[in-house]
Amino acid sequence: MGASTGQVADSIEEMARDTVAFIRAMGYEKVHLLGLSLGGFVTQEILRIAPELIARVILAGTGPKGDRGIERVARITYYDMFRAFWTRRDPRYYLFFPESSEAKVLGQAFIARTNERVNRDEPIKISVLLAQLRAVRSWAKGEPQDFSEVNHRVWFVNGDNDRMLPSAGSYDLSDRLPNATLIIYEGAGHGAIFQRADLFARQATTFYLADK
């Protein structure tokens, strides 16, 4: 997203409208969505405002609107960015992965994979980060959404030790979605889908291709 141009939205609702506009501009009638973290908030809002565009949904490392535990994201982000600066590590090493030795090894492997290719993006601008944190804070303080009429197949995956977005929110949100399946990866954190990348890729492919 660092290479993107234009004005960055500072609300989940506006981000969702922008995403819907992009999907329609590309000429797609129906899409599968994978929403990770803040992207999961955006995906939930798209389910509400444009359900006709969506085939199946994967939500990963995210949480429901109105979960006040999500307000801690800014504090944790700043703290881990500070730790990363002093230890000369990628912030994701702290943000995405628990403190266990196995998780840290898998986290380092993920970061190494992302660094294999160069010139894919630009560093995220501070203005973008601040806009995202404002959007997250508003989401945490919002009214819970009603998904009782949403019949889309939804697969929810998270780790059991998500520092950024409380893992308990995964259970709450999956209960709100009538046709949702929740899988919790043991010993994984906010970056569960990266920590268990091979397993997630197989399961996600099976989910998206089911009934074809």
Predicted regions and their residues:
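Active-site loop/oxyanion-hole signature of alpha/beta-hydrolase fold enzymes
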Residues: 1-34, 202
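Short beta-strand immediately N-terminal to the catalytic nucleophile in serine-hydrolase-like folds
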Residues: 33-35, 60, 157
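Gly/Ala-rich beta-loop-alpha elbow adjacent to hydrolase catalytic centers
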Residues: 35-39, 43
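Flexible "cap/lid" loop of the alpha/beta hydrolase fold
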Residues: 48-49, 55-85
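Conserved alpha/beta-hydrolase catalytic His-Asp/Glu region
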Residues: 89-141, 145-146
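Short beta-strand/loop motif that positions the catalytic acidic residue
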Residues: 150, 156-158, 162
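Catalytic active-site module of serine/aspartate enzymes centered on a nucleophile-bearing elbow/loop
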Residues: 180-212
